[in-house]
Amino acid sequence: MQRCEITGTGLISGNQISHSHRLTRRVWKPNLQVTTLVVNGSPIKVKVCARTLKTLKGASEVEVMRILKANIATLSERLLKHLNK
């Protein structure tokens, strides 16, 4: 499933509304991008949404660790494993 590995942002479903106000179900997908983070000295490729990527852009390793620890409840299991090393 498409989900940001840091914030947990995933699919959102709702209605698409036409000009005549006819409702059809649709799904909004997160804008996921693959980026490399340095966690505990080792590079890791992660899928993050564009908003998270904007936050991480230009962040030092210390700031990245602070962001990861702030979102510990929504981190993927793979990131949790690297964080606990």
Curated annotation (Swiss-Prot):
Belongs to the bacterial ribosomal protein bL28 family. One of its GO terms (biological process) is translation. InterPro entries: Bacterial_rp_bL28, Ribosomal_bL28, Ribosomal_bL28/bL31-like_sf, Ribosomal_bL28_bact-type, Ribosomal_bL28_sf. Keywords: Ribonucleoprotein, Ribosomal protein. The gene is rpmB. GO terms for cellular component: ribonucleoprotein complex; ribosome. Coiled coil: none annotated. One of its GO terms (molecular function) is structural constituent of ribosome. It comes from Fusobacterium nucleatum subsp. nucleatum (strain ATCC 25586 / DSM 15643 / BCRC 10681 / CIP 101130 / JCM 8532 / KCTC 2640 / LMG 13131 / VPI 4355). This is Large ribosomal subunit protein bL28. It holds the Pfam family Ribosomal_L28.
